[in-house]
Amino acid sequence: MVPRISEPQLRPEPHRAPSNSTKLSYTSYSSSFEADDERSSSADHDSMGPDIGSAHRDVPAQYAGEDTRLTSRKELSGWYAYGFAAEVFVICGIGSFIPITLEQLARENGVLLSDPTQPCGSSSTHLPPGLNPGNAKDSQCVIYIGGLQINTASFAMYSFSLSVLFQAILVVSISCAADHGNYRKRLLLFFAFAGSITTMLFLTVVPKVYLLGALWAIISNTCFGASFVLLNSFLPLLVRHHPKTQYGTPDFSPELHPSFVDEYPPEHSLGESEAEVYDERSALLSHNRTLSEAPDVTEPLPLSADSTSIELQLSTQISSTGIGIGYSAGLFLQCVSIIIIWLLKGTTFSLRLVLFFIGLWWFLFTIPAALWLRPRPGPPLPSTGNRNSKGSRSWLAYTIYAWSSLFRTVKLARRLKDITLFLAAWFLLSDAIATVSGTAVLYAKTQLRMAPEALGLINVIATTAGVLGAFSWAAISRALNLKPHQTILACICIFESIPLYGLLGFLPIVKRWNVIGLQQPWEMYPLGFIYGFVLGGLSSYCRSLFGELIPPGSEAAFYALYAITDKGSSVFGPAIVGAIVDGTGEIRPAFWFLAVLVGLPAPLIYFVNVERGKEEGARLAEIIEGFRIKDAEIASGEHSSTESISEDERGRDHREISPHDEEREGRRRNDI
């Protein structure tokens, strides 16, 4: 055993390249949740050189308690591990087996719509003589909840809508805690374990207590959405402190002894007062000022032209790798689930058992993330009055600040025509994506009488096509010389073919053929491929196009609005489809609504002008930055004469833009 060197020879820290999204500072205090990278094995050094993530760097702190140790390979592995753990829930759970299980549990408590005296039984059993899968209206099943007659397919759709509603509210409420204080990792683990345990609890749901299944679905989906928002909030920090970003070249990183950090006690805590009030982007974006008076004695390299591209490429690389790892886990577990269901003859117990394994997978592979991810605390919450008040750190303060930040961002977005058009289109498109998926699965189960293992195979095909589409649409766009918004329009047009194909089943001539128009189970497989292929293009190009329209310096706030629009929109589509099914007794009429929902975003996307949006965003960014600098100067002058400054005394919140001041600024620019 090699003895530990008590007095290591310290090497000087190498030059680092400054970056528009990076800032080095003191390390943070330790935490019980913190990854122990100080004594990593040599296995951790493969891809990033020496594991210098624990190296103390004697430079000014951006805010009290900041952890700016370099991102280590182990920390990246922890980030990937959670994607590997949780992605199976959305692919195998919400995307496939949870709606099937909810419908089946309700069906075993329901009666036939055509004959209320007859119990429904399983929807995957053989059809009565003379009844083909495409016109199985007489096999529709209903349950009664609180005196209301609800179709069993609608029951699953309503449950999903409620889960998305709670998810959207929770995501907004915790967004501030994700960026401020030391709650990011703790909340991630709380929601991860809560969601995985409730998913495992599906094993205990018997048909007599089928409503409990809806409760578990709502809780698990809400926890999943919240945990992924928290996981994504780690990405900018991992990129910011990555050696490739800090030292300006992909292959250069310093070599410091791993135990060096042990000799330096923490110098700040989150409870200390600050000389500067930070806005909601503090944890994700860089600032031009630091709190510490200690000078940065390192000699930076000249700022290279590709400094920003290094960060962008690294962020894309890490994100893409995480998505690939998550999809691989989802596909693997989906195949295992299909085998389990096939071996157990597609019983309700087999569905519950599969959901138990999905929750167990989520739980077990969250443990490496808990061990390897660092907390990476954000700046303390900006106080709104007495800076010594503990109320500024209370959960109520976090929640109020989160919602007020959202409203401020909405006010800014309303001033940008192209962002408004895009967000309206994305709201409809995101709702259409979620609603088409859930409707198709339930249509295949209730009207085409497809077995659960066959439904699982549809999801495998769609997921595989999604991966293929993510890579293929870039090549298609280059080959056809399409602009980003034109590529999105092409995806929408292909997407529209899915509900239109389902509507062909209403044509008398097609009905006589007994094929085409979703009258046979095998027709679901090519449609599943189309859905996945289109989704791969929409996901990447919509986010990319939106990024082009964001005012520089407001990326975090606007991407939060983008995510909330994505999460919140799916409340409406499934609920409307459920109401249509309850009113007509069939799912096929819902394809009329889906056709409209898929088509509505197209004209909005068509009128988005990227160049105009960039110009508007740049002008707004100048106005925002001008008022931030002015407020910073006022705060600096007043802070020198008094220890505590109230925002009310200053006259306005430094994060808000005065419409009158903006109007005067616009007139001044026009005069110039």
UniProtKB/Swiss-Prot annotation:
Entries under Gene3D superfamilies matching the protein: MFS general substrate transporter like domains
Amino acid composition bias (Low complexity), ranges on this chain: 19-32
Keyword terms: Amino-acid transport, Autophagy, Glycoprotein, Membrane, Transmembrane, Transmembrane helix, Transport, Vacuole
Subcellular location: Vacuole membrane
Chain spans, region Disordered: 1-66, 634-672
Pfam families in UniProt: ATG22
Ranges annotated as spanning the membrane: 82-102, 154-174, 187-207, 211-231, 323-343, 353-373, 421-441, 456-476, 490-510, 515-535, 545-565, 590-610
Glycosylation sites noted in the Swiss-Prot or TrEMBL record: 20, 288
InterPro entries: Atg22, Atg22-like, ATG22/LtaA_families, MFS_trans_sf
One GO biological process term: amino acid transmembrane export from vacuole
Membrane topology: Multi-pass membrane protein
Biased amino acid composition, Basic and acidic residues: 38-59, 647-672
Single GO cellular component term: vacuolar membrane
Function, in words: Vacuolar effluxer which mediate the efflux of amino acids resulting from autophagic degradation. The release of autophagic amino acids allows the maintenance of protein synthesis and viability during nitrogen starvation.
UniProt record similarity statement: Belongs to the ATG22 family.
Protein name (database record): Autophagy-related protein 22
Originating species: Botryotinia fuckeliana (strain B05.10)
